Amino acid sequence: MARMKARSAKGKRVAKDTWKSKVWYDIYTPQSFGGDVIGQTPANDPATLIGRISEISLRDLTNEHSKHMTRMYFKVDGVSGNNATSQFVGHDTTREYLKSQVRRRRSKINAIVDVRTKDGFKLRVKALVLTAVRARDHHKTEIRVKMEQIIKDMAKETAFAEFVHAMLMGGLGSKIYGDCKKMFPLKRVEIFKSEVLEFGKVVEAPVEEAAVEAPVEEAAETQE
């Protein structure tokens, strides 16, 4: 019996701890977003990092507390050493914040617009206008048409990085508010979501020369 126990113990396989063999990689934003480290991720093979999505709040990226409700998404597109480069693929706004902005006796006007920037990036932009008082249907239609035109015009006239900055930091929302309030009293404008549908051509200074690169034709969809 003692021999059997000894043989059983000797033949037992020890599970390999794959976690200890993983390497940690720093994820960097594009240079147009400051080229900052926004997180770390582990991997056994650097090729498996390509396509991973990293999330960070706009508050953490810019140190502006008022941007706490905005989440940005970056997709890893290259790896060199222990550094991973990324591309901006979209943003969204927390549901709790959007719900908190809606009040009784106000109208909510949504617009969903597909646009292309001056340097060839295609995005889907979702904007929201809240009126100061309840609006009639024809006012809603007029405001929506105006919103869509402003978004398309700004995208067409600016490069991708500049357009994204306008979306996130308030430039686009301010333009919509300023023009549409002449048509009807407004309370607030939010560019609450965006999604990169196609990448154009942009020159970035990578952290190091990329050893592993991913195609740039497709973008991952951000979560609702």
From Swiss-Prot:
Protein name: Small ribosomal subunit protein eS1
Keyword Cell division: no
Domain of life from the UniProt record: Archaea
A Pfam family hit: Ribosomal_S3Ae
Keyword Ribosomal protein: yes
GO MF term set: structural constituent of ribosome
Keywords assigned by UniProt, alphabetized: Ribonucleoprotein, Ribosomal protein
Residues annotated as transmembrane: none
Organism: Methanococcus maripaludis (strain C7 / ATCC BAA-1331)
Positions of disulphide bridges: none
Matching SMART domains: Ribosomal_S3Ae
Similarity section: Belongs to the eukaryotic ribosomal protein eS1 family.
GO BP: translation
GO cellular component, one term: ribonucleoprotein complex
